[in-house]
Structure formats: structure tokens, C-alpha cells
Curated annotation (Swiss-Prot):
GO terms for cellular component: cytoplasm; plasma membrane. NCBIfam families: DnaA. Residues 1-87 are annotated as: Domain I, interacts with DnaA modulators. Residues 342-461 are annotated as: Domain IV, binds dsDNA. SUPFAM superfamilies: P-loop containing nucleoside triphosphate hydrolases (SSF52540), TrpR-like (SSF48295). Its main location: cytoplasm. Plays an essential role in the initiation and regulation of chromosomal replication. ATP-DnaA binds to the origin of replication (oriC) to initiate formation of the DNA replication initiation complex once per cell cycle. Binds the DnaA box (a 9 base pair repeat at the origin) and separates the double-stranded (ds)DNA. Forms a right-handed helical filament on oriC DNA; dsDNA binds to the exterior of the filament while single-stranded (ss)DNA is stabiized in the filament's interior. GO terms for biological process: DNA replication initiation; regulation of DNA replication. This is Chromosomal replication initiator protein DnaA.
Amino acid sequence: MAVSLWQQCIARLQDELSAQQFSMWIRPLQVEMEGDTLVIYAPNRFVLDWVRDKYLNIINQFFTEQMGSDAPNLRFDIGSRPSARPIVQATAAIRTSRPVSREVVKPSFNTPHADPIANANHRSNINPTYQFDNFVEGKSNQLGKAAAMQVAENPGGAYNPLFLYGGTGLGKTHLLHAVGNGIIKNNPNAKVVYMHSERFVQDMVKALQNNAIEEFKRYYRSVDALFIDDIQFFANKDRSQEEFFHTFNALLEGNHQIILTSDKYPKEIDGVEDRLKSRFGWGLTVAIEPPELETRVAILMRKAQESGINLPDEVAFFIAKRLRSNVRELEGALNRVIANANFTGRPITIDFVREALRDLLALQEKLVTIDNIQKTVAEYYKIKMADMLSKRRSRSVARPRQVAMALSKELTNQSLPEIGDAFGGRDHTTVLHACRKIAQLREESHDIKEDYANLIRTLSS
């Protein structure tokens, strides 16, 4: 009874969670009955702890509603259920265009070593400085880091391919190298390759020129893990897409891990064949968003600590509130502050930072104003600027207005009452409600999440 109800339980979870959350945390689970106990198997400790902390109450509540006092005890365990017993997986409830295997086969990491192309070493370009330990986690990148950690622990498993997308300088490349370092740590003989998509194109062109295309194919199809950054640069390169299509298929058929990154959601990449874009979404697709204020502060504090600099909290918040677009911009600004402090011997204060970053701060303040946000959002949603300030409450107008209010709260230093005044004299509680509503919708709606990220990129560029 409890095992059969598990299907209904995961259906409820699928309704309540985002597609990313369901695919990452619920989909890998397996269950079986042991006496009056329902054992929930997670693939690793990370998933087990997350599900128990975040979703145990929902699961308990469901079984209590359905079975009352007969509800089973719940126990979590790591691994798979004994193979001789019946199995129910969460994959039964998820809708996917790709058939999902009942059994995950880990790559053997024993593939014969192919002849290298252009004297390339299989993993010479995995940067050992990029680790999970020095990746600053926040709400904006939490899912991406969690997925990457699971891939590092179980390459070729549930999240294959893993597709990370988001603007430049948000940490996608850091995560690729961290996964590579994790795989190599667990499997020193693993053949892990990281590269920019242009390198793949260059290798293919060189192979064609040297009549070595078969060696090229053997090399790329022999790796245990292939990580390609900025896959959007394959756009309009038909021969490269053709070769990558077959490489992709060969690696997935062998349960070898693929991770791709892009600045866009897979289906939005122009100039790439539909059959490739479809395959990009076969595994797990995760957005990496611009870091929120707390994460930006943490990044600055971590970077300062690594540089041996004592950065006052108020200075970190001052910089983080004004530079919002990406991690590289933050680190570049901090490097400039540190260099100026070392050169002048002056203490790092807010006034000192104002002086050291005066051109950068002036540019940011000039670019991001409430008026600019309103115009950008109105143009994006194809509504009139007058509607943004009007009392109209139709969803086609109210939702863009709420988005603009939330962006104004995040991207400017204006107070809630000041933002309300700029939106037709609205009360600060209206602005607060809009901010909370958009935050909720960004968790629940892929479209709103994409719109918000696109607008931040536009306003911060």
C-alpha cells in the first residue's frame, strides 16, 4: 500500500516543486518496504540530507493524510534498494522526452587511451585552483553547485548531460573545473577534458586539414568526461555541430559524463540545430543567476581573505550594493581597491572606496535608475510607459510593473517609499508585496525566472 502511494506522493512533490528541484532531488530516489517501514534510498549523502531537511515534512504529511495511523515509518538510506525486490522510482512521475533507464551504470574509466590530437593531454587543462570549497554558494547558484557536486560524485549518472546557463562571470567555468577536480580525486585514471567550444572547432579543423578526422573522433569519444564551455559558439558551424552530435551520442551511450555551459537556455540558442538543442535538455538544465546581495558580500569577503586583506563589513556591503552584474566585476573592483590601498598606504574605508572606484560607481549609477528600469521593462513586455505608472490591474500590465518594482529594489539604492513614488505614488507596502511576489514567481515559473535574468543582464551590461 505505502509503496504504491509513493507514486502519488512524488506526483504531489512534482506539482509543488520546480522542474529543476524535482529532477535534482526527487527523481533519483528509490523506495521499498521493510516490515512497517518505508525505506527511501538516495544516491548519496548530499541528496539524503537535502531531502530529509527540505521535504520530509511534506512526505510525512502525505502518508498521514492517506493512511492515518497506519502511515509507515520512514527511514532514509544511501544506495539502491536490493535488486531482488520491487522498485518504485520517482522517474515514473516525471515527464521527459528521453526514455529513462531504470538502472544507472557508472562509467568504468577504463576506456582505451586514444591517440591525442595536437599532443593534447586528456586533463592538462583542468584548473586545480577551482574547487567546490572555494566556490561561494548563494541562492542564485545553489542548484548549480548541488548538481555539479552530485555529478562529481556519480559521473555518468542521473544528470547527464548537465547544462548550466547564465550570464558571463557568474561561476559556470568554476563549477566545470570543480567537477573535473572532484572526478579526478575519486578516480585518478579518469580521462577528463575541459575546453571552450572554439577549441573543439579548432581541433576539428586541424584534423580535417591533416586528414586525421578518425583520430579526432577516437580522441573525443574515448574520454570519460567532456566539459565544453560556451556551447553557443557552435552557432552556424554546421560541420562542428555534426561532429559534436555524434560525439555527444557516443559518450552518452557509454554513460560518460557531459557538462555544457551557455549564456542562454538551450532552446534559445540561435544557429544551433534543433536535434542538438533537444539533446542538451535530456539531463538536467540549471540556471546560474547573478548573485544576490548577501552572496556578493560573501564573495568579496572570501576574495579579501585570500588576498590577506581585512575588508570591513561596511565596505563590503558598500561595494556589493553598487556592483551587481557578475562575480568578475566584483573581484576586479576589489583588486583595484586593494592595489590602491597598497600603493597609497591608506586604510580601506567607504570614502577611500568611493575615490578608488569613482569612475566605475559613476557609470553604474548613471546606467541603473528607476526610470531606466521602467523603460527597459516596458519595452521588454511591450507595454506603454504610461501603463507602468497607471492604476491598471490587468495581469498584462500588473506583472511587468511588479517586475520593474522588484528590479528597482535590487538594482538601485532607493528606499521602498521612493520606489513607490516613482511608480505613480504607490504605497511602500505595494512595492514590498511586488518584491515578494516576484521572488516567489522566480521559484515557481521558468518564464518569470528567465525574464528577470534577461532584464538584469540588459540593465547591467
